[in-house]
Swiss-Prot record:
Belongs to the bacterial ribosomal protein bL36 family. This is Large ribosomal subunit protein bL36. SUPFAM superfamilies: Ribosomal protein L36. The keyword Ribonucleoprotein applies. InterPro entries: Ribosomal_bL36 (IPR000473), Ribosomal_bL36_sp (IPR035977). GO terms for molecular function: structural constituent of ribosome. The keyword Ribosomal protein applies.
Amino acid sequence: MKVRASIKRICKDCKIIKRHGVNRVICINFKHKQRQG
């Protein structure tokens, strides 16, 4: 999980979702997991 000020999709499988007011990137590649904070 990477915590970044600005999150971006790294590949076509990445999805940006909002969970409890926090933007997250979920992907089949676990290295692409990100959280905005």
